[in-house]
Amino acid sequence: MKLQDKVVLVTGGSRGIGKAISKLFVKEGAQVIIPSKNITKLEQTAKEINCSFFIGADIKSKKDVNNAIDQIIEKFGGIDILVNNAGILPEQKQLHMINEDDWNEIIDVNLTGQFRFTKAVITHMKKNGGSIINISSDAGLKAFENFYADAYVASKAAMIMLTKSWALEYASDNIRVNCICASVVDTDMTNSFWLDTEIKQKNTAKAHPLGRIGTGKDIAYASLYFASDDSSWTTGSILPVD
């Protein structure tokens, strides 16, 4: 097992990509902790994947985030791996139709929320080193025609640059920071973004050289590489998975 007894925190781990990552990491021997404000969904996921520990926490609340980290440290003694995965997709709107509340909601969850968790974790991780994995998107690397999600793409591009910055800042503490840029993945969140899921999935699949859209498992195995000692000499890397 590649993650035997490692303590892993996965934000957004109760569904979609985060759930797939959590499930694989548990199989690899990790003690996985999932924070979320949706307790019902948390309990369901924790039971399904045999999750070690789950905590009610709103990623938009500094107090909730700090309390969650304090509970984890008290119970497990430290955090070896942080997966910054939580994220939401906006309703498709062009720039002139976006109001500040729309913008702020996406930025608060997709960017500032990841900052909150990383800041709270890194103080403890500095003691023994660790790995931070940021889940971004290919929408943070390039623009797509008719994809009206300005706050989303801004948040994902920002996570890419924070990956590079944090990798340099904390290399001397033996903390590796890497990023995965996922393309279109078959999740409930992605499907809710499309008006006609079946047609959109088929058309999107055709745009990929391998002829299909991604699965949570595709992203989970890429995350496992960055979480494990297989990538012990890798930091600041941006890995497209598409």
Labelled PLM ranges:
Residues 2, 175-176, 212-241:
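C-terminal substrate-recognition "lid" of short-chain dehydrogenase/reductases
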Residues 14-15:
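Conserved glycine-rich cofactor-binding loop
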Residues 47, 146-148, 179, 184-207:
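A glycine/serine/threonine-rich, flexible loop-to-helix segment
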Residues 93-95, 102-105, 200, 204:
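Substrate-binding pocket helix/loop in short-chain dehydrogenase/reductase
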Residues 118, 155, 163:
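Active-site helix of classical SDR
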Residues 123, 168-172, 232:
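Alpha-helical segment proximal to the catalytic Tyr-Lys
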Residues 137:
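Residue(s) in the substrate-gating loop at a strand-loop-helix junction
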